[in-house]
Amino acid sequence: MKLNELRDNPGATKNRIRVGRGIGSGKGKTAGRGVKGQKSREGVSINGFEGGQMPIYRRLPKRGFNNPTRKSFAVVNLDRIQKAIDAKKLDATAVITEKALIEAGLVRRSQDGVRLLGKGELSVKVAIEVAGASATAREGVEKAGGTLTVTGAAAEAAPAAV
């Protein structure tokens, strides 16, 4: 078999139907749109219009609000940090900072920094410095003999919860 002999399997592709190309095609004249009326015209559909019936986006109540002070963290779990240490992408002897996590490819840069979550376990002693952390993440780091430093807005806002 050669590259120029490659073909799709029979029935794998369908030819598109060209409408409005004469009565012999079966899709000529009105091109499958029916006869007259708003829907037969060009540029017809008005998004959300339901023929005069109260549209669903007006029948349902408004909910929620956009919080202007919301924090947006990139999240990383303990098990991903451990895998990166095992793969020699992170140095366990140095302090693991947000910059180190980005360079290792564990997180992308985020607006308000990195938040550490507690899924998985650490098997080595590490020092981690992040913008936020869950209680289980703190337990996991301290259980392995490491230290966790929370910097940034999360530490100032709720030191008891972090």
Curated annotation (Swiss-Prot):
InterPro entries: Ribosomal_uL15, Ribosomal_uL15/eL18, Ribosomal_uL15/eL18_sf, Ribosomal_uL15_bac-type, Ribosomal_uL15_CS. The keyword Ribosomal protein applies. Disulfide bonds: none annotated. SUPFAM superfamilies: Ribosomal proteins L15p and L18e. PROSITE patterns: RIBOSOMAL_L15. The keyword Transcription regulation does not apply. One of its GO terms (molecular function) is structural constituent of ribosome. Residues 1-44 are annotated as: Disordered. Residues 21-35 have a biased composition (Gly residues). GO terms for biological process: translation. Gene3D superfamilies: 3.100.10.10. One of its GO terms (cellular component) is cytosolic large ribosomal subunit. Keywords: Ribonucleoprotein, Ribosomal protein, RNA-binding, rRNA-binding. HAMAP family: Ribosomal_uL15. Part of the 50S ribosomal subunit. Binds to the 23S rRNA. Belongs to the universal ribosomal protein uL15 family. This is Large ribosomal subunit protein uL15. It comes from Rhodospirillum rubrum (strain ATCC 11170 / ATH 1.1.1 / DSM 467 / LMG 4362 / NCIMB 8255 / S1). The lineage of its organism: Bacteria, Pseudomonadati, Pseudomonadota, Alphaproteobacteria, Rhodospirillales.
